[in-house]
UniProtKB/Swiss-Prot annotation:
GO terms for biological process: tRNA wobble position uridine thiolation. It comes from the Bacteria. It comes from Blochmanniella floridana. This is tRNA-specific 2-thiouridylase MnmA. It is found in: Cytoplasm. Belongs to the MnmA/TRMU family. One of its GO terms (molecular function) is tRNA binding. The gene is mnmA. Transmembrane segments: none annotated. Catalyzes the 2-thiolation of uridine at the wobble position (U34) of tRNA(Lys), tRNA(Glu) and tRNA(Gln), leading to the formation of s(2)U34, the first step of tRNA-mnm(5)s(2)U34 synthesis. Sulfur is provided by IscS, via a sulfur-relay system. Binds ATP and its substrate tRNAs. Keywords: ATP-binding, Cytoplasm, Disulfide bond, Nucleotide-binding, RNA-binding, Transferase, tRNA processing, tRNA-binding. The keyword Cell membrane does not apply. The keyword tRNA-binding applies.
């Protein structure tokens, strides 16, 4: 009997994943990871409640639950990288980092080496398919819940040891199963936002770790419109929190961030979500991962997702070097944010991805500083 360690988060997806693997004949055990040390603002931290729910789930399913603390690894490999990216003017994706560095690295190693597992499993909405002795990562059946965007860094050795039992189910079906099993998580809300921030105000949380300096907000013509509260608090395409809503150049459209200059501490804005300064067809991607391990040597046509739950866009990929790609979209897209992930697909198959480092607006944004 093959042994599977299921990452039990205290949510409905992982609890149903564990039950499904039991039905498939695996020897199932649970593991709860603590990735963030509780601070003095306990009302914002759900880890104690999640652990309690994890115990309840495992008791109901009659499986053992292991606990492990990866807070140090998370701090060094996820949170510090997250902070450095924000300080550099990027908008990072900590979920991608967490999957790469914690769930499918430290958790996988711990399960295989310390707990003697054959596989690990999680409640991600993705599927795997074995094609010509290579494992392909595929989108989950539920298009609204597909999480392949967050798993593009996985390699063949990792995928060979991973099971994703709910990838062929819809969220509705998962909740229905949980209710039939009387699991405590059946009606539990999905977690949203950045896990270590929880319900806290993003700006106040980040200011505890990053030195913040207010600066000018200017429009694309160089006119000063107001003051920003610190460049790291803003991302390309952001509308809220600018506090310049009453200022207009005549078209009455809301203001959006179209560029950030870290060196001069200046935020540049323009009006309208489809402003040419916010729209792009071309961008550069680095830190490349190919799921099948093949290095791209010639241009290909595929589709790309530039943020979670956004529709894929047809594109051409041109390799500039082993770790740098030029992406040309079939049609312009608004608010491409450097620091976010660009994930590539051929139909339902996730083939890889990387980190957006630069975008090229439809019209050049002139320097006035």
């Amino acid at each position: 009997m093959k042994k599977v360690i299921v990452g039990i988060s205290g949510g409905v997806d992982s609890s149903v994943a564990a039950w499904l693997l039991q039905q498939q004949g695996y020897l199932v055990e649970g593991l709860f990871m603590k990735n963030w040390e509780n601070d003095d603002e306990k009302e914002y931290c759900s880890s104690e409640e999640d652990l309690s729910d994890a115990w309840s789930i495992c008791n109901t399913l009659k499986i053992p639950l292991h606990t492990v603390n990866f807070a140090q690894e998370y701090w060094e490999n996820v949170f510090q990288v997250f902070l450095q990216a924000y300080q550099s003017g990027f908008t990072p994706n900590p979920d991608v980092l967490c999957n790469k560095e914690i769930k499918f690295k430290h958790f996988l190693d711990f399960a295989l080496e310390d707990l003697g597992a054959d596989f690990i499993a999680t409640g991600h909405y993705v599927r795997c398919m074995n094609v010509k002795k290579k494992i392909t990562l595929m989108k989950g059946i539920d298009q609204n819940k597909d999480q392949s965007y967050f798993l593009y860094t996985l390699n063949q050795q990792q995928l060979k040891r991973c099971l994703f039992p709910i990838g062929s189910l819809t969220k509705l079906t998962v909740r229905k199963i949980a209710k039939e099993l009387n699991l405590i998580t059946a009606n539990k809300k999905d977690s949203t936002g950045i896990c270590f921030i929880g319900k806290r105000n993003f700006r106040s949380f980040l200011s505890n770790y990053i030195a913040i300096q207010p600066g000018d907000i200017i429009n694309i013509h160089g006119n000063k419109l107001g003051l920003h509260q610190g460049i790291p608090f803003y991302t390309i395409g952001q509308r809220k929190g600018l506090n310049i809503g009453g200022i207009s150049n005549g078209n009455g459209k809301p203001w959006y961030v179209v560029d950030k200059n870290i060196t001069h501490n200046v935020l540049i804005v323009a009006q309208g979500i489809n402003h040419p300064c916010l729209m792009s067809r071309i961008f550069i991607v680095q830190k490349i991962f190919w799921i099948k391990g093949n290095i791209l040597k010639s241009p290909i046509q595929c589709s790309v997702k530039i943020r979670y739950q956004q529709s894929d866009v047809q594109c051409q990929i041109y390799p500039i070097s082993v770790d740098t790609l030029k992406i040309i979209l079939k049609q312009p897209v608004t608010a491409i944010a450097p620091g976010q992930s660009a994930v590539f697909y051929i139909k339902k198959h996730c083939i890889g991805g990387g980190t957006i480092i630069k975008r090229f607006p439809l019209i050049h944004i002139k320097n006035y500083y």
